[in-house]
Amino acid sequence: MAEAAAERDAREKLSLWDGRPDSMAPLTDRQTDSVLELKAAVENLPVPAELPIEDVCSLASQSLPIELTAVVPDSTEDILLKGFTSLGMEEERIETAQQFFSWFAKLQTQMDQDEGTKYRQMRDYLSGFQEQCDAILNDVNSALQHLESLQKQYLFVSNKTGTLHEACEQLLKEQSELADLAEHIQQKLSYFNELETINTKLNSPTLSVNSEGFIPMLAKLDDCITYISSHPNFKDYPVYLLKFKQCLSKALHLMKTYTVNTLQTLTNQLLKRDPSSVPNADNAFTLFYVKFRAAAPKVRTLIEQIEQRSEKIPEYQHLLNDIHQCYLDQRELLLGPSIAYTVTELTSQNNRDHCALVRSGCAFMVHVCQDEHQLYNEFFTKPTSKLDELLEKLCVSLYDVFRPLIIHVIHLETLSELCGILKNEVLEDHVQHNAEQLGAFAAGVKQMLEDVQERLVYRTHIYIQTDITGYKPAPGDLAYPDKLVMMEQIAQSLKDEQKKAPSEASFSDVRLEEGEASGLRKSGSTDSLNPRPQTTISPADLHGMWYPTVRRTLVCLSKLYRCIDRAVFQGLSQEALSACIQSLLGASESISKNKTQIDGQLFLIKHLLILREQIAPFHTEFTIKEISLDLKKTRDAAFKILNPMTVPRFFRLNSNNALIEFLLEGTPEIREHYLDSKKDVDRHLKSACEQFIQQQTRLFGEQLEEFMTKVSALKTMASQGGPKYTLSQQPWAQPAKVNDLVATAYKTIKTKLPLTLRSMALYLSNKDTEFILFKPVRNNIQQVFQKFHALLKEEFSSEDIQIIACPSMEQLNLLLSVSK
């Protein structure tokens, strides 16, 4: 019982080992899996061999594995034999109970032993493992000790190695820095070391500027000078810079000598060809250009090197200037005599034709300037102002020949044509399209143009004074209207001949109807007078029929318009038009004295219309500004200060001092006056038209106006208290007298109106202009008759009105009607 209790207690304690809530000996998942595998294997253990057959047979057949059925002994004896043999009792027999219990005890002991054998074997097996594990632990501990020692040694060696590595890196860094420093020093010293090499090459007698090594040596020399110049803090800086400068001077001297000798040799070769004669224009190109162009490649490469360095190094710029000067001197030496000879020859050929001389001379200089620029570009790549200076000097020879001729030209036609040639043909057509090459030539041409314009302005002033202001008209110039009638008759006869022979056109007919029409605008048809184109040209509109001063003024202005500046033209046009208007006024007065007043008035109106029409195409203002000094305030202030009443105010120390007032109030004023020639023409035209209208109105209605004036005076006297009157009883206002007055006025209109209209048609020859000019006259006459009709109705009876027999307004309008 005690053993059962102990076994039960042990099992309870064993059950607590792996209890879920509080396990005393918890197993890992792997250990649990191992136990489960062992449990599954134990469930299929074979039946022990020593088990009695009866026990074996008593076992349920389903509980025995299939494998055991094959090993069941054939007889009980064999089983018992094996069991006794295993117990060492094969010779014994159980015959008594004591033997049985003894056998049973042995069997139980044997079974207990057999049952504990596997545990002991496992214990022994595990003990072996334990011993091996202890040995391994000892080895591991020993290895750990060795590793710890090795780690200490490794740390020691690592520290030493790191220190050595850092030292090596520092040494390598210092070595690299020293190498870089040495290389940097060597690089800097290389510029200094080049001195001996360059100096040796420059002192070599075989050195030539055309050799292959000269340009690279020159580049090295430039680099050395540039480097040393940029490091003035180097030791021996002045010494080396001076030595390199000396080398540069030698190199520049070699280049200058070679270039100058080449250019001078070319010049000498050309001059030695024919020293006795000056080259003419035909072989000048061959002599002066072909040779130089052939020699250009010899020096162009060298000059390019100089030009590339000229902006960086001043010595090269000086050398380039010297080469430019040498080249231009040689060109001047060659071209100077040739150009002078050619200009002289052109002058002798065109001595009387100034325009042809200017054209040929300018064309020659244009070719010279273009050829010189092209030749210069063969030698040089960069421009220079010295070339233009040379060309300007060469153009001076042309100017020196032309100027004496220009200042002696007196004809405005020649001067205006010269202006047109220089301004249009030369400057606009040639210079503007090639301004770079012809810049120097343009300066000379502009100077010539200024001289021609100045001469033209001067001659224009003289022309205005002599030929316009001082013009003395010939009798034929004032033969109006006779010359117009004669020209009209000639034109009519030509028309009649043309009708008879329509297929034949005479020269005179073409000249009258076509030539003048194409060259002139239709005169008298201005915008303000409502123009209407005409199919034929009136004799008054022919250019040759204009008054000479008008023709001269317009021709003069037409020549000046495109030749001089706008401001100068405005001043001259003002002067010319003013002189022309004065001459027309004088001519009109002379015609009025010699012929009739209407002839003088229509002459003036016609020519003022021509003037206004012909100056309209000039797209400019005919306005000039005149400045004058107005001394009126100064004069008033002076009279005021000289007044005896103001003498005490001289000594006042306030703003009422007389001297201060004189200084403040006596300042002269500057006045500006604007003179407009177009407005002046319009003003005189308006005045002439008004005079014509007034004169014609007086001619046709003066008697009636005088009668109405007397009636107005009589009414005034009566209204002021005078005696009452009856107009028909007045001696001068009797119906018969008034009838004579009306008949005379009507007869005057009927007889003289056709003459007036005929004169207007003869002078103006434009229906629109005639209608516009006569319309105010007709209106004035109509107003006079309307007033007269009103007076008759007011002052006379119907019987008296019948006696007076004044024409009706319809009759008057029919008489005054003028078809447009």
Curated annotation (Swiss-Prot):
InterPro entries: COG3_C (IPR048685), COG3_N (IPR048320), COG_su3 (IPR007265). It is a peripheral membrane protein. Residues 1-21 have a biased composition (Basic and acidic residues). The keyword Zinc does not apply. The modification Phosphoserine is found at S655. This is Conserved oligomeric Golgi complex subunit 3. Pfam families: COG3_C, COG3_N. Component of the conserved oligomeric Golgi complex which is composed of eight different subunits and is required for normal Golgi morphology and localization. Interacts with TMEM115. It comes from Mus musculus. Its main location: Golgi. Residues 1-26, 496-535 are annotated as: Disordered. Involved in ER-Golgi transport. Also involved in retrograde (Golgi to ER) transport. Keywords: Golgi apparatus, Membrane, Phosphoprotein, Protein transport, Transport. Residues 523-535 have a biased composition (Polar residues). PANTHER family: CONSERVED OLIGOMERIC GOLGI COMPLEX COMPONENT 3 (PTHR13302), CONSERVED OLIGOMERIC GOLGI COMPLEX SUBUNIT 3 (PTHR13302:SF8). The keyword Cell membrane does not apply. Belongs to the COG3 family. One of its GO terms (cellular component) is Golgi transport complex. GO terms for biological process: endoplasmic reticulum to Golgi vesicle-mediated transport; intra-Golgi vesicle-mediated transport; intracellular protein transport; retrograde vesicle-mediated transport, Golgi to endoplasmic reticulum. It is found in: Golgi apparatus, Golgi stack membrane.
